[in-house]
Design a protein with these regions (language model features):
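Active-site proximal loop and beta-alpha junction motif in alpha/beta enzyme cores
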Residues: 1-229
Length: 229
């Protein structure tokens, strides 16, 4: 059996909502050849396997494929390592080094990661005129199966955005909170953003220049349980 931490990443101010994430802090508990199957069994939009806690070397799997980088797994893993007492300032997924910073108390504050927008999956950013139209979606428009991120300004002057995200092809369906797409949107708009995605998750994102952007938010530990390796 392997120890699985289940987090909710990008929670709102009250600790609600957030995108579920599975993290195995000791990647050696799950053989590399089993990781894709384990991610499929769990069914989270992403599952993380930390291969070395001291260097924060990590791998990220959706139910259908491995990703070189993803936002909510990076934020969640950074938070969990800090929660477990690890002083990690950089994560190391396959895409490259991801800087970590924190605001506020260790568990109750906000966790941020910085990455290049080009590391993100190829989300298509589709702007809507009205946030109500985004909120009313009951699935990807036209039954599209590609990776789409639908968004509208709630308050453009204040940088407030309403969004939804779908990725049917890799088995995710609707993604409750998508850090990599938030990074792309911040880089594309050149704006500091507060994004309300899915049912009510909150993401904070801002461009850093030269193709880099930062995304962060609140994280809650939902449960710890054993899972067959």
């Amino acid at each position: 059996m392997a120890t699985l931490h289940v987090l909710r990443v990008f929670c709102d101010e009250a600790g609600g909502f957030g995108n579920p994430l599975g993290v195995f802090l000791d990647g050696a508990e799950v053989p590399p050849e089993r990781r894709q199957a384990v991610a499929h069994e769990l069914g989270f939009s992403e599952t993380v396997f930390v291969d070395d806690r001291s260097t924060a070397a990590m791998r990220i799997f959706t139910p259908g494929l491995e990703l070189p980088f993803a936002g909510h797994p990076s934020v969640g893993t950074a938070w969990l390592l800090a929660h477990e007492g690890e002083s990690v300032e950089v994560l190391r997924p396959p895409a490259g080094e991801v800087a970590v910073r924190r605001e506020g108390e260790r568990d109750d504050g906000l966790t941020f990661v910085s990455a290049r927008a080009e590391w993100s999956p190829p989300w298509q950013l589709i702007e809507y005129d009205e946030p109500a139209a985004v909120a009313a979606l009951d699935g990807p428009p036209g039954g599209r199966e590609d990776e789409i991120y639908l968004w509208a300004w709630e308050d453009e002057a204040a940088g407030r955005v309403r969004s939804r995200c779908y990725s049917l092809a890799d088995g995710v369906g609707e993604d409750e909170a998508t850090g990599s797409a938030a990074i792309m949107l911040a880089e594309a708009t050149g704006r500091e953003l507060l994004i309300r995605q899915g049912e009510g998750s909150l993401l904070r994102a801002r461009p850093l220049g030269d193709g880099w952007a930062e995304v962060g938010g609140g994280v809650v530990l939902a449960e710890v349980r054993d899972h067959p390796a």
